[in-house]
Amino acid sequence: MTTIPLFFTFDEHYVVPALVAFHSLLAHADRQYRYRLHVLHPGISDRARRRIASVVGRFDHGEVVFHDTSMYEAELASCGGKSHFSKEIYFKLCAPTLFPECDRIICSDVDVVFTGDVSKAYFAYPDEDFYYAGVDTILPTNRLPLYASFDKEEQHWLAREICANFLLLNLKALRRDDMQRRMTEYYKANYARLPFPEQDCMAIFARGQVRPLSMRYGVSNVYYRVNADTTPFYAHCLCLPADDAARRAEFKAALADPIQLHYIGAEKPWNSCGVPKQGVWLRTLWEAGQTMYYIRCLPGILRQKWRRYSLRRFIGKLMRKIKQ
């Protein structure tokens, strides 16, 4: 039986969403394959690991392996947290050496619900030379002014970057071209000015060596707020057809039948109310048998949210005073 490897990076604060993500992934995965879920973590508790293993263990085609990354703390001491991002994202760039036994691997965030089978993505582009495959930007974005300090060539590729919430990594090609060393050095040297650190590094260094996956592998929950008949699309989008009618038809089809539903931004279905597609996440939480565990964790989840919210408000006020 072919084993499909996947890896995820998160800390103790994301254990509840990870339980939902893992249950939904395995519930919808093609059972002719085995799925090895690698968890890269900075020392999550034994209790959390046992709970994750219990959820994965309900599926005979799934297994989970834990990798403690706390040994890298000194290496990343210069990289603080960014909003709802964390240092764990750094390890998306380290997959070539973290998984020497793999030629390919899927990487996914855990603020997601899987509603379809991911296995076909693992076998995409079998005869092509590429570094990454994923879903690129679908709708117009206001992030490009954030890259004013980058040179013109870097801005060209940053405008065409793929989203890092679901990626197929061609580890063989990344190793061959020493991409891990190049990207991690750049990451650490430029962390303070990278709005989306690992995603930006991939865009700058992978350049033309990326391939589009179907939009179904990365449907953001905020897409359900737009009018699919009238919304404009991002100029450099490759995941959808160029023809407007065909593009809208495929966009609607992806919304109706996503493989991965991604909850973007700081407002998550487990820490906020009124989040688009929150009901899907809560229903999957129930199906995973983790609703009572979530309720027990909720006070800590809300404390974490408000700590980050207060920090963002403080930084915002500080920046406004500096500009006065």
Region locations from a protein language model:
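Histidine-anchored nucleotide/phosphate-binding helix
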Residues: 15-30
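Active-site-proximal specificity loops/subdomain of glycosyltransferases
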Residues: 55-98
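Conserved donor-nucleotide/metal-binding helix-loop-beta segment in metal-dependent transferases, i.e.
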Residues: 112-148
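Short internal beta-strands
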Residues: 36-43, 134
